[in-house]
């Protein structure tokens, strides 16, 4: 099960990397730790959860909005999805913000 060294939630984006399939999922949240946890407890992206449940290994990276160079979570998320090809070659179903 995931364990987090961080104990304080923050606004930002998170990158879930499926090491077994070389696929990314990028999401955003005002409380990033809660959003990350949702994906591994069946309350987030169903495909991510299914792969995790059946044994795929994941790594997690989180980027705080503060000092990221972006003004909004939407901008940071869109940029991160594009950077990791999470829409074209990953789990993301949109290019960001449900667009």
Regions found by a protein language model. Name each.
Residues 1-34, 38, 71, 75:
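GIY-YIG nuclease catalytic motif and its immediate N-terminal context
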Residues 1-2, 53-54, 64, 85-86:
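Short, solvent-exposed coil/turn linker segments
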Residues 3-5, 20, 57-59, 68, ...:
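Generic serine detector
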Residues 30-75:
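Conserved short loop/helix modules at catalytic or binding sites
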Residues 80-81:
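Serine endopeptidase catalytic core focused on the charge-relay Asp
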Residues 84-99:
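Coupling/hinge elements of helicase-like and P-loop NTPase modules
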